[in-house]
């Protein structure tokens, strides 16, 4: 067994360990505590070490724009995924519009990037993610209110307070603060050697805990509900296939040939969906607390289930692709994988929801029979 395959096997064992711990620690406080540690301590420490350990190139400043462009492209292609998956419920469609184009690489990708691609790739990923954060925090916030106003026929836009809260969240989030601090530190011509060794050792020790804690958290996040599973799994395959297809096409068109960058963008394109759109939907849901459930703008329960399945799906998918890293460096192979994901998503949609396709087929046959009867009657009238 190769060293990469061996390490990935260990990762899967940690996920399994987390899943088994789920039955021991079934209180939400345990899971929430792990999440707080990851997002507020382990990830910021790891990102800081990765950024100050590399030389930041001025071209890195374009990375957030690349992420923003990718988010917007997936957002406008989301109706295609919804059409393929036969989602007809308006509340679910709005919920998926919010989620499908969002990405959360911090939990699903950063530990893997840190382990397999190194400091420089993690530094790039952190800067790229800032563009994604602009999209999920600001753009999707306005989308949520647009859906709310349209659904409730509401023209009053008293959004100043929540907008201020969102902007504060953007700049006060620990990961973003660390990115700004690290970039300011490097822009002052300082290096990692200018940081006290005690602080470096502390951050390094915290960094070493990131991967196992995240993988255990992913194991804890795995849920099994047959009906929910059948509705969400096809969409996760469709989303991954579309994101992989677009990122690969963009890299080929722009002439990317750096192996580490190719692997980095492939991994990032397979990130799980972000929690931030769910917070926007929850905020809107609170505004609609006096409205009947079926008339609300979003289906927050469905959104929460989608989040719960997205994180383990993304991480397991990425880990499954890494044993043969050379596979990811051939664009034809990646195209094949992305198209396979799309076909699997379509196949699962048909298998899990056959009645939708049968009803469509029935409607189609009814239409054909109507046309046939119309022309038959017309012909008989003419002959008479």
What is the role of each PLM region?
Residues 1-384:
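Alpha-helical transmembrane segments of multi-pass small-molecule/ion transporters
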């Amino acid at each position: 067994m190769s060293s990469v395959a061996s390490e990935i096997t260990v990762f899967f064992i940690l996920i399994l360990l987390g899943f088994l711990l789920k039955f021991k620690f079934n209180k939400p406080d345990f899971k929430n505590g792990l999440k707080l540690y990851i997002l507020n301590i382990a990830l910021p420490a790891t990102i800081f070490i990765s950024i100050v350990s590399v030389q930041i190139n001025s071209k890195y400043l374009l990375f957030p724009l690349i992420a923003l462009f990718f988010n917007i492209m997936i957002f406008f292609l989301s109706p295609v995924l919804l059409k393929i998956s036969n989602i007809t419920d308006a509340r679910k469609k709005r919920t998926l519009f919010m989620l499908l184009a969002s990405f959360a690489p911090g939990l699903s990708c950063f530990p893997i990037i840190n382990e397999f691609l190194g400091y420089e790739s993690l530094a790039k990923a952190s800067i790229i993610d800032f563009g994604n954060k602009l999209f999920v925090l600001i753009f999707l916030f306005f989308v949520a209110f647009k859906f709310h106003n349209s659904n409730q026929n509401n023209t009053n836009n008293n959004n100043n307070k929540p907008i201020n809260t969102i902007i504060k969240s953007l700049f006060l989030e620990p990961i973003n603060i660390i990115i700004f601090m690290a970039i300011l530190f490097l822009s002052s011509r300082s290096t990692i050697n200018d940081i006290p060794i005690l602080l470096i050792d502390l951050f390094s020790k915290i960094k070493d805990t990131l991967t196992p804690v995240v993988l255990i958290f992913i194991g804890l996040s795995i849920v099994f509900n047959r009906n929910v599973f059948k509705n969400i799994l096809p969409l996760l395959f469709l989303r991954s296939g579309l994101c992989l297809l677009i990122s690969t096409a963009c890299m080929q068109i722009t002439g990317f040939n750096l192996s580490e960058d190719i692997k980095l963008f492939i991994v990032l394109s397979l990130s799980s969906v972000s929690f931030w759109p769910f917070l926007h939907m929850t905020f809107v849901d609170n505004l609609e607390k006096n409205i009947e459930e079926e008339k609300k703008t979003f289906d927050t329960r469905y959104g929460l289930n989608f989040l719960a399945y997205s994180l383990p799906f993304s991480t397991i998918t990425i880990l499954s692709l890494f044993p043969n890293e050379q596979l990811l460096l051939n664009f034809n192979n990646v195209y094949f994988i992305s198209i396979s994901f799309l076909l699997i998503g379509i196949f699962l949609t048909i298998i899990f929801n056959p009645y939708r396709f049968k009803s469509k087929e029935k409607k189609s046959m009814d239409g054909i029979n109507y046309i046939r009867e119309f022309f038959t009657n017309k012909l008989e009238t003419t002959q008479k």
